[in-house]
């Protein structure tokens, strides 16, 4: 369903090691909004919910709710760092168009 690069796995592990709240994975949710119609919402989570797909890779879990699953099927998640910023990059084959910011799609 979702592929995580080594860089994304390392970023998730780092975030999990820094949180004060109990968490063992990353939740990816697709919500209406953004420049192109949909946007990604990311957060740390500690458990799966009814209907979630749970992807395990490199010792981390990714939770995806049932409504978001069709939007992210086949997606690759990467993490990049640059001079001005760092963040997750989404290579989503379901996106017909992407916003220049890289955080929303349609």
From Swiss-Prot:
One of its GO terms (molecular function) is iron ion binding. One of its GO terms (biological process) is iron-sulfur cluster assembly. SUPFAM superfamilies: HesB-like domain. Keywords: Plasmid. Belongs to the HesB/IscA family. NCBIfam families: iron-sulfur cluster assembly accessory protein. This is Uncharacterized protein y4vC. It comes from Sinorhizobium fredii (strain NBRC 101917 / NGR234).
